[in-house]
Amino acid sequence: MDKPVVRISVRNLVEFILRSGDLDNRGGSSDREAMQKGSRLHRKIQGRMGSHYRAEVSLKYKTEYEDVSIQVEGRADGIFTEDGQCWIDEIKGVYADVSQLEKPVEVHRAQAMCYAWIYAQEQKPEKIGVQMTYGNLDTEELKFFREEYTLEELGLWYQNLLDRYHKWIAYQFAWKKERNASMSDLEFPFEYREGQRKIVSGVYHTISTERQIFVQAPTGVGKTMSTIFPAVRAVGAGLGENIFYLTAKTITRTVAEEAFSILKEHGLKFKVITITAKEKLCFCDKTECNPENCLWARGHLDRVNDAVFELWTTQDSYDRDTLLEYAKKWQVCPFEMCLNLAVWVDAVICDYNYVFDPNVYLKRFFGEGTSGEYIFLIDEAHNLVDRGREMYSAHVDRADVLEAKKLAADYSKGLVRALEKVNRQLRTLEKECTEYEILPNPGAISLGMLQVMGEMDKLLEELHGKELPEQLLEFYFCVRDFLNIDELLDENYVVYTEMGEGGKVILRLFCVNPAANIHRCLEKGKSAVFFSATLLPMDYYRALLSTRKDDYGIYVTSPFRQENRCILTGRDVSSRYTRRGYEEYHRIASYIARTVWTRKGNYMVFFPSYKFMEDVLEVYENEFSAEWVRCISQTSGMNEREKEEFLEEFSASEGTLVGFCVMGGIFSEGIDLMGEKLIGAIIIGTGLPQIGTEREILRQYYDKKGVNGFDYAYRYPGMNKVLQSAGRVIRTQEDTGIILLLDERFTGKDYRNLFPAEWSDRGNCTLNTVEEQLGSFWNRIREKN
């Protein structure tokens, strides 16, 4: 049987095995201008070396081990002969003063040494030299470092380097053999519920055909296990290599972890990591990733490979506690260790941004020119529309430019000049802007921002780790974001200006349809599964999340008995802006009171905004309060502890508890209050987003595209909030409860067409009939039990 061949580039090999030193986020990152200057410098140096200089020479060499072949490959910047001596040239462009460089960077030397060894296998010279050429990107001043090696010296060094890498590859192949063997008899861990088998077979078929599928399945079907199980089986069958379980909320990450744990209890061998936000993993009070401010950053790169290898080879599940334990043991940054470990595991559970966000994505998996046999499971996929728009949009605020210019005065005249140029360009746009102004493109501002980025990168490199003011560093990331998004501009974007709160203009690059950007990320893998309890209407979500025309779609109906819940629409009440006032608030408060008086228990009432909620709550408490009914309300910006305390009230309550909440907020999705913890949801209004610039731009954009712009900008996003809120009630087969939709608009065809199929038994009510109708329902439930 042929041995597997592992291919790795020279650069990736040396940067992985030979990384050393500190973590330091104070330096600049490569931007387009630096890359372009670097390429020009390479070509200039190569061009002036004469005809004897061979540029960009492709090299590769395969080393045989007992279990695997490792092929190292890459392109040497230059190869030339001087006085009969062969030299390998490695060129690096820097902003630093090259005359101050005392020695070459270790990984640069190592790259040249790898190329020297590979080249020597063909030519067999007695000696070979390596030259490290450093060039300043602005002045083009050069500095050379030269070293000579015998073939024996190079051979011993190269073999040691490769043996250190082979250790990782040998364990990886042994583990995969054990992993795949564990899946041969793996069965679905539960008795199939109604609809689950349909999802499992649909997902497996999708992966096997390398396509995408949209799964609309209500709460209670068991979507998490129904997507993870077939994905795991597909990996075992060689149809994929890594699973990425993507979520928008922490709670759904926990559910995914539990699903993998259950499969492991049934014999599965699978290494699963959960990527936790840096702020939640950091040992320090403030995430300052540099050796001066963080003990764990100091020498991190010297120790991280040993830390990762031990953790990888001794554990199979990597949650927050495990990561912190090993990071403490090895004195490394837990977040960076987590990212390094993710490369070697079978499944990654993480937020959307680690795959889709152009500023945060995992570059080892999704960087330019990289791809793999990845299976993407996208949970709560309805959230990806707005998250996608957010990730693929950017802006520059003239107020921020002026503040950055003021701060830069102490550091760089070049940066001040570049910022003033952008300021003048924005000021011109400001004069033409009233409410908002749509532009054909960003114009010269893109070039101006590129020059700002170049000056900031130069400054960061020249500072050699000295700190910039935090505000200036934040502006640096804002510029980087703007330039990243500027590269993506196409017909899916609207460029516009609007006036900021401080009276200064803001230029926005607004991604109205994120589908093409999402597609570019997903085509790095093999297959994608979008699933949610609220992907209605499915055509809307397919249009905004995918550009493919061959996507599958599955609609699974609720496994719960309709007779266990009552859905009523209040046809004599409205949340329209024109109707808001005491009379309507009183009617809504009366509806709430009559609902909770019908049966003792816990209820949630969902409002379109905090203001609306507070106005109705005031009327309710003044005119309908009762000693046996307790009210609690959601507040803006609740932290994790406050959220937990709010939810704990529903477990502890023995009387009647009414939770006043906001639609689309932290309590309207992703929470499980089963059984008697929640017996009713009262939903006030259709959830329409507030009218604003972005929503109006969306409406106009889709009207021009020939679809109903109001639906895309307002109705569909609003209805999603309604469906999510309604989904808080009835979480298991045994649950009973009521759902009240209080807005006359729900009786219209435009909204009825958006209801799930299982709402076919929905009835209408008025304030005069609601008590009787709900009373009849609860009486039937009592009689049945």
PLM features: residue spans?
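Metal-dependent nuclease catalytic cores that hydrolyze phosphodiester bonds in DNA/RNA
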Residues: 1-85, 110
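Mg2+/Mn2+-dependent nuclease catalytic core
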Residues: 61-155
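Conserved pre-motif I regulatory segment
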Residues: 174-216
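A substrate-engagement module of RecA-like helicase motors
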Residues: 186-187, 239-348, 356, 406, ...
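Walker A/P-loop
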Residues: 208-230
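Signature of the SF2 helicase/ATPase Hel1-core->accessory helical subdomain module
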Residues: 227, 254, 328-347, 351-456, ...
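A contiguous, basic/glycine-rich beta-loop/short-helix subdomain that forms a polymer-engagement track
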Residues: 323-348, 359-366, 459-574, 579, ...
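Conserved RecA-like P-loop NTPase helicase motor core
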Residues: 571-583, 635-746
